[in-house]
Amino acid sequence: TLKIPSLNVNVKVYEGTGSSVLAKGAGHFEDTSIWDGNCAIAGHNRGANCYFGDIHNLNVGDTITLTTRLGTRTYSVTSVNKISETDNSLLAPTAENCVTLFTCVRNQSAYRWAVRAVEV
């Protein structure tokens, strides 16, 4: 479960990022860690399950909480960036524990919002 208190987001995270997964909630990028290092998660920005519609409004220092079968961790937002849809650099493994959130940029299909938060 992913919680973003400043945006009133409380969403279950499923494995995978296909359209059927994102129709239910947020989706974990299967090639990234679910716990140690970089855990990358995608979500829709509009429609019935638009849990990530406002992530571009997050501020540095806002908190994100991720609960998995391994426990609960709290993260602090360190960056919010608009990136190219082909930029996969934020999916790379990291030494520090972090969560990276992705969603589409409304009406700009070539771009994505990417939010990085590190464990506190």
Q: Which residue stretches match the model-derived regions?
A:
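Solvent-exposed, non-transmembrane regions of membrane-associated and secreted proteins
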Residues: 1-120
